[in-house]
A protein has these predicted regions:
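Short amphipathic alpha-helical segments
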Residues: 115, 216-218, 272-274
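C-terminal substrate-binding/catalytic lobe of Rossmann-fold NAD(P)-dependent dehydrogenases
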Residues: 181-247
Length: 314
């Protein structure tokens, strides 16, 4: 539902090639009747599907909601939820786990996701920042104040054009937006508080608009006496069973993660400070790829099915 946006396009690309999936319909009110490849031009030659005006929720096993934030609540007010339907919502409406939804960050809640019918997919920045901090929270090592900055590509703003996504403005440019009050902070803090009992700290998060199309590069730093070796061991052990979260042996760059479902984490410690970097593709691990990962877990498929993607090296 909501098939014309960037996340829906990436979701379609992944599901077309998924070994266990047959797409029932791709709904779009604004593009009903048009070929999907006329909107998502990268799918030319890969699918003959057309956008549907109507749909039958009883005819599918899993529904992905790719509408704008706030529209999911309205959707369920207008459509009864079939008893057997599994739902993965990419909007932020139910990330607080209201209405029976489970928060869908596999590295945090894999077991709960496996038994869930309703999953709320995390936000893109929320994914990168949580993966940067979850091991510290699990070890009870989060300080009262955490400094974070992250640079995101223009696709994070969605498919609808705006003044800050216009090429002439975005190219060769950087700008801060929503400093200290980004909407993803709520879901990040909720997860951290659940892991580190009694933590009620502050995250000073400064998001930055980058002059590239896709990807997030997040930098989190705290004051701690932990050595780099100990920090690397902590993160490696925490993510030992996470197939897409990788602790890199050296420095991390964005191209290691873009076009994949990976979260690539870098660890640097010096003189009482720890820096954790995290690179993800905002449209994949930050959205559609993670949604497919959640579907795989919910359905009992191989968690990596349809997601074995290689980054572009150059």
């Amino acid at each position: 539902i909501g098939g014309a946006g960037y996340t829906a396009g990436e979701l379609t690309r992944l599901l077309i090639n998924h070994p266990e999936v047959e797409i029932g319909f791709i709904h779009s009110t604004s593009h009903a009747g048009q070929p999907v490849s006329a909107v998502h031009e990268g799918l030319l030659g890969d699918t003959d599907l057309c956008f549907a005006a109507d749909f039958d929720l009883n005819a599918v096993d899993v529904l992905f909601l790719c509408q704008g934030h706030g529209k999911s609540t309205q959707f369920w007010a207008e459509h009864p939820l079939p008893d057997t339907l599994r739902v993965i919502d990419l909007a932020q409406d139910f990330r607080d786990e209201s209405a029976g939804y489970v928060y869908g960050l596999p590295e945090l809640q894999r077991q709960r996701i496996s038994g869930a019918r309703l999953v709320a997919n995390p936000g893109c920045f929320a994914t990168a920042l949580q993966l940067s901090m979850l091991p510290l929270a699990a070890a009870g090592m989060l300080p009262d104040r955490i400094s974070v900055s992250g640079v995101t590509g223009s696709t994070g703003a969605g498919v609808k054009p705006g003044s800050t996504t216009h090429f002439s403005w975005r190219s060769d440019n950087l700008s801060v937006y929503k400093p200290f009050n980004h909407q993803h902070l709520a879901e990040i803090c909720r997860s951290l508080k659940g892991l580190q009992n009694g933590w009620d700290g502050v995250i000073d998060f400064v998001p930055v608009r980058g002059n590239f199309a896709r990807g997030i590069y997040a930098m989190t730093w705290i004051h701690t006496d932990m050595t780099e070796e100990a920090a690397r061991r902590l993160y490696t052990d925490f993510y030992a069973t996470a197939p897409f979260t990788i602790v890199a042996p050296g420095e991390v760059d964005l191209k290691q993660a873009v076009n994949t479902n990976k979260a690539v984490i870098g660890i640097t410690a010096t003189e009482g400070r720890l820096l954790v970097t995290c690179a993800i593709d905002n449209l994949l691990k930050g959205a559609s790829g993670q949604a497919v990962q959640n579907m795989n877990i919910m359905a009992g498929f191989d968690e990596t099915a349809g997601l074995r993607l290689k980054p572009s090296a150059f």
